[in-house]
């Protein structure tokens, strides 16, 4: 018989840098999860992504045990990295903060493919291009 699920917690934590401080500690403490156990397991799994924001979905069970699923870093992180920017435009649609090439958008799409709601690479590239546009970053051919 499957374990009974108590709830889910969605967080975005820097890879390899989970610690009991907010937002991790309070979110897990409310559900009665062993915070240090989660932090050690998360940091071990995300050593390769050090310094990148990692979305994680934690499944909490009734017996206070947990599982977690790591997703790939957000598309906005990859887009800013490719455009060599710290942030997007203050006025997307009016001012352009930077640009990325279509090839860079394809590379980002291949990295994000498993987390995107797309069936092929062409659709995934359109999603990434839309994200870039909403950040005020132009996609050039």
From Swiss-Prot:
GO molecular function of the protein, one example?
Answer: large ribosomal subunit rRNA binding
Please give the superkingdom of this protein's source.
Bacteria
Q: Which SUPFAM superfamilies match?
A: Ribosomal L11/L12e N-terminal domain, Ribosomal protein L11, C-terminal domain
Can you summarize the PTM annotation of this record?
One or more lysine residues are methylated.
Give UniProt keywords alphabetically. Methylation, Ribonucleoprotein, Ribosomal protein, RNA-binding, rRNA-binding
- GO terms for cellular component: cytosolic large ribosomal subunit
Q: A GO biological process this protein is involved in?
A: translation
The record ties this protein, via Gene3D superfamilies, to: Ribosomal protein L11, C-terminal domain, Ribosomal protein L11/L12, N-terminal domain
Keyword Plastid carried by entry: no
Pfam families assigned to the protein according to its UniProt record, in alphabetical order: Ribosomal_L11, Ribosomal_L11_N
Similarity comment text for this entry: Belongs to the universal ribosomal protein uL11 family.
Q: What does this protein do?
A: Forms part of the ribosomal stalk which helps the ribosome interact with GTP-bound translation factors.
Q: How does it assemble?
A: Part of the ribosomal stalk of the 50S ribosomal subunit. Interacts with L10 and the large rRNA to form the base of the stalk. L10 forms an elongated spine to which L12 dimers bind in a sequential fashion forming a multimeric L10(L12)X complex.
This one is known as Large ribosomal subunit protein uL11
Q: Which organism is it from?
A: Pelagibacter ubique (strain HTCC1062)
Gene it is expressed from: rplK
